Amino acid sequence: MKNKRSQNSPYVTPNNPYLTLEKALGYSFKDKRLLEQALTHKSCKLALNNERLEFLGDAVLGLVIGELLYHKFYQYDEGKLSKLRASIVSAHGFTKLAKAIALQDYLRVSSSEEISNGREKPSILSSAFEALMAGVYLEAGLAKVRKIIQNLLNRAYKRLDLEHLFMDYKTALQELTQAQFCVIPTYQLLQEKGPDHHKEFEMALYIQDKMYATAKGKSKKEAEQQCAYQALQKLKEAK
């Protein structure tokens, strides 16, 4: 079992090896065992790992982020709010928030995961972030989680709006497929129709020669982003 912060690190104190993490988070755990559980991946083969906390954290974060978006984007309809939430409540979105507090440096993973750079994997890092937020919820309640998430969103995203996040789907998918399959997705133009001033493009997305999505858009780029969004949802459901 490995923890990246060595005892010689300036970030480690004898009484609290997680002091810097808690400062970045803006919350100090009363029960450090709960914090350690949230940071412990199942690969460690310990009696307590973060899987149960991850389950709770997923529900807590879905509610908190949904509420924040509901109040912030009063002009968005249900469809736009759902797309916006899906881009944040995802492995890519939670990994982005986790890296804002350098959570990867504190994960407890097995030696084999350490060798394969497991602490940087979106699946492991995002799950640990969900577990961490569940721990905060259990100790301090929903209001504290809400405050932490609001702060992290402001730090992790220069612009929190549908257009900006939507344009990040291709990047998110590429990072995920490289981590899971060691390949990047490919896009193919299926159809182009309409006059020059009103073109419509239909694109297909493939991962390892398997078609994952098709979508239409006013440009190839827009259609590719739609494809990437669909593929991300399929991979999330298959997790």
From Swiss-Prot:
Top-rank taxon: Bacteria
GO cellular component: cytoplasm
Residues annotated to bind Mg(2+): E54, S127, E130
Active-site residues from the entry: D58, E130
Residue ranges annotated for the DRBM domain, each copy included: 168-237
SUPFAM superfamilies per UniProt: dsRNA-binding domain-like (SSF54768), RNase III domain-like (SSF69065)
Pfam families: dsrm (PF00035), Ribonucleas_3_3 (PF14622)
Gene3D superfamilies attached to this UniProt entry: 3.30.160.20, Ribonuclease III domain
Domain RNase III residues, every copy: 18-141
InterPro entries xrefs: dsRBD_dom, RNase_III, RNase_III_dom, RNase_III_sf
Keyword Chloroplast: no
UniProt cofactor(s): Mg(2+)
Catalysed reaction equations from the record: Endonucleolytic cleavage to 5'-phosphomonoester
PROSITE patterns linked: DS_RBD, RNASE_3_1, RNASE_3_2
Keywords from the named record: Cytoplasm, Endonuclease, Hydrolase, Magnesium, Metal-binding, mRNA processing, Nuclease, RNA-binding, rRNA processing, rRNA-binding, tRNA processing
GO molecular function, one term: double-stranded RNA binding
Compartments (UniProt record): Cytoplasm
Disulfide cysteine pairs (residue numbers): none
The protein's Enzyme Commission number: 3.1.26.3
Main location: cytoplasm
UniProt function note: Digests double-stranded RNA. Involved in the processing of primary rRNA transcript to yield the immediate precursors to the large and small rRNAs (23S and 16S). Processes some mRNAs, and tRNAs when they are encoded in the rRNA operon. Processes pre-crRNA and tracrRNA of type II CRISPR loci if present in the organism.
Record family assignment: Belongs to the ribonuclease III family.
Subunit note: Homodimer.
Annotated protein name in UniProt: Ribonuclease 3
Organism for this UniProt entry: Helicobacter pylori (strain P12)
Name of the gene this protein is made from: rnc
